[in-house]
Design a protein with these regions (language model features):
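Transmembrane beta-strands of outer-membrane beta-barrel pores
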Residues: 63-69, 100-104, 142-144, 153-157, ...
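Outer membrane beta-barrel transmembrane domains
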Residues: 113-124, 248-291, 307-318, 324, ...
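Short glycine/proline- and aromatic-enriched beta-strand/turn motifs that initiate or cap beta-hairpins
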Residues: 52-88, 95, 412-415, 426-428, ...
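Outer-membrane beta-barrel channels and translocator barrels
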Residues: 89-91, 142-145, 173-175, 239-241, ...
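Outer-membrane beta-barrel translocator domains and adjoining extracellular loop/strand segments
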Residues: 71-76, 97, 107-112, 152-154, ...
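Residues on the lipid-exposed face of transmembrane beta-strands in outer-membrane beta-barrel proteins
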Residues: 82-86, 136-140, 166-170, 232-236, ...
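Transmembrane beta-strands of outer-membrane beta-barrel proteins
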Residues: 57-61, 94-96, 145-149, 177-181, ...
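Outer-membrane beta-barrel translocator/channel fold
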Residues: 97-134, 178-242, 254, 335-383
Length: 442
């Protein structure tokens, strides 16, 4: 298990063209990123559509690569993924997908600040893990309304996840106004050492490996994580050239919200304990996006502003712009840039061994998660989409009504304003993201 940055996860989401509200805890954010990333070749048998006109199917093969280069704690995430959608009738669509995160690299298992008398840098440990996730769902469409439901099961050596999601939407005013309401519920379990609830947080130990997890091993325990996610979206087309989207998202989290592998130095003598976070967290975000098509340039320009706040006192702001242009009828390109900034969590300190207020303890909690420190980041990137359209009787490659391929690249740089490893600035603050995807409809 390793924790990836919220911004890296957000970048990965954008690479795949999906917008989600991140509501996972620190221990599971890497899993969410894995859900969005995909790399390596996927082989899938493609079946010709049946002659019946009501039968429509599409296949998506996604590939992407996340790399966080570093001399001591580099990280690589690859994830083959495939999705199949079949419509046996004009009102029902069935979906199924599979993905497998393949994670490798090194991570510092001990966090200490400028005053720590412990060698933090050489504490990086190498790891490798694979996560498998299966999703099944359906969509019912009737006139101007639709209902979608899905279930996902994910498993890896030290984590189990069960989640369902439901969304409903409608459009009116000649389809110029669209409303969407979504709810997701997660029932997760994370493996930790077998400390008792009555044990003092300062005496709890971190995991050193996943051996024995989810077995009868008396040195291991399973902790629950409850996730509730809500989202409300309003999309409005004002003119043929201008449209906006307003999205409100909220999340409630309860349970073990730390990293079971990470220890924090909490005393001048070098005493260390398992990372200790509050068991409850509420999160909210409000985003506004506008898109305007300039006919003279044949280019669509977009702007996005997003504000984030949670009960751990983190306040984040995201600003993004992009431009999309058809170079040819079959080739579309997009360039974009994004800036993100956030404040620190209420209990954050780079060093928990000193005194208040510049450094030292922050109440009863301590953390080694850089995503709870004050930081900012910028992202630049782009993607290209190639589409080949066919028609009945003249299919692409003899089987597809439509075939498309997309390639994307993003560069992400993070500025950590108050996070060190034993007084040293981490060198893993750059992330590179590649994506490659194919879609066939038949």
């Amino acid at each position: 298990m390793v924790v990836l940055s919220r911004e890296a996860a957000a970048a990965a989401i954008e690479v795949l063209g999906v917008r989600l509200f991140s509501t996972t805890n620190a221990a599971s954010e890497r899993r969410s990123l894995g859900c969005w990333l995909g790399v390596a070749a996927c082989a899938l048998t493609l079946l010709r559509a049946a002659p019946a006109t009501a039968q429509v199917a599409s296949v998506d093969l996604g590939t992407a690569l996340f790399q966080e280069p570093s001399k001591r704690s580099g990280l690589t995430v690859v994830n083959p993924s495939a999705a199949l959608s079949v419509s046996p009738s004009n009102w029902l669509s069935l979906q199924a997908s599979y993905e497998a995160d393949i994670v490798s690299g090194a991570s510092e298992s001990l966090k200490g600040g400028r005053l720590s008398n412990v060698d933090i840098v050489t504490s990086a440990t190498h790891f490798a893990d694979t996560r498998h996730a299966l999703t099944g769902g359906f969509t019912i469409t009737r006139a101007s309304t639709h209902l979608t439901a899905s279930y996902t099961y994910g498993t890896e050596h030290d984590y189990r996840s069960n989640a369902f999601a439901v969304s409903a939407g409608t459009d009116f005013l000649q389809k110029n106004t669209q409303l969407e309401l979504s709810y997701g519920r997660g029932f997760d379990h994370v493996c930790t050492t077998a400390y008792a609830a009555s044990d003092a947080p300062s005496s709890r130990l971190a995991l050193d490996n996943s051996t024995g997890c989810f077995t009868n091993d008396k040195k291991r325990a399973s902790r629950e994580i409850s996730l509730n996610n809500f989202q409300l979206g309003w999309t409005q087309t004002w003119t043929p050239e201008f449209a906006t989207q307003l999205v409100f998202s909220a999340a409630l989290q309860n349970g073990f919200l730390g990293n079971p592998y990470r220890s924090v130095v909490i005393a001048p003598a070098g005493d260390q304990a398992l990372e200790n976070h509050p068991e409850n967290r509420a999160r909210g975000a409000l985003g506004l996006r506008g898109k305007y098509y300039v006919r003279s340039l044949e280019t669509a320009f977009s702007g996005d502003v997003r504000l984030y706040r949670d009960t751990w006192d983190i306040f984040g702001q995201t600003f993004e712009v992009d431009a999309e242009h058809y170079l040819f009828p079959w080739l579309r390109v997009l360039a974009r840039g994004r800036f993100y900034n956030q404040s620190k969590a209420l209990f954050w300190s780079d060093d928990y061994t000193g005194g208040e207020p510049a450094s030292g303890p922050r109440g009863q909690y301590w953390s080694g998660d850089r995503e709870l420190s004050p930081l900012s980041s910028y992202l630049v990137g782009g993607r290209a989409l190639v589409t080949k359209e066919g028609r009945p009787g003249a299919r692409v490659a003899g089987m597809f009504l439509s075939l498309s391929g997309a390639f994307g690249f993003d560069f992400l740089k993070t500025n950590l304003r108050d996070f060190t490893l034993g007084g040293r600035t981490p060198d893993d603050t750059i992330a590179l993201l590649w994506s490659l995807g194919f879609r066939g409809e038949f």
